[in-house]
Amino acid sequence: MKSVRLAAFAAASLLFTVSLPAAAQNDPFMGGDYVSVTGVSIDDGHYMDYASFLSGFYKAQEDFAIKQGWQTSYEILSNVHPRKGEPNLYLVRRFKNMPDAAEGDRRQAMIRNQVKMDETQMQAASGDRAKFRHVDSEMLLREMKWRK
């Protein structure tokens, strides 16, 4: 009796193992680009302060990332009619894959060299912006592409 139950369990396990690849073949989607979305709110009276940062330092950094092939695009979206508690802006970045730790460190070093700032200076600048700019949300999404 014990061997019959064991055989039945093994057969059921095999059934599930075989059906998983079949289900994957039927999935009409495959993963595409990753999309990073950061929701940012800006205190009243500080729009131009943050807009100046975005049009200078931020734009240069994002353009550098595209030139290096690290990301495919970026955009800034304005929340035209934000409800209470919603961000004013969404910073959107698209990229093909996630770097491993070593590659991430290499990229950070290249960015610091490009902007001529060390980590302490970059953190201090971020802290200065945090007086009027607040990161409300961060999402990492993945594009769902149709299989052909």
Give, region by region, the residue ranges found by the protein language model.
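Hydrophobic pocket/interface hotspot
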Residues: T38, Y50, L91, A101
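Short, solvent-exposed mixed-charge patches
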Residues: R147-K148
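N-terminal signal peptide c-region/cleavage motif recognized by signal peptidases
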Residues: T17-P21
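Acidic/histidine-rich, surface-exposed loop or edge segments in extracytoplasmic proteins
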Residues: M30-G45
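Short beta-strand/turn micro-motifs at beta-sheet edges
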Residues: A24-P28, L77-V80
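N-terminal, post-signal-peptide region of Sec/Tat-exported proteins
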Residues: D43-Y90
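Bacterial N-terminal signal peptides that target proteins for export
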Residues: M1-A10
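An amphipathic, aromatic/His-enriched active-site/gating alpha helix that lines ligand/cofactor pockets
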Residues: N26-F29, A60, F64-T72, R94-L141
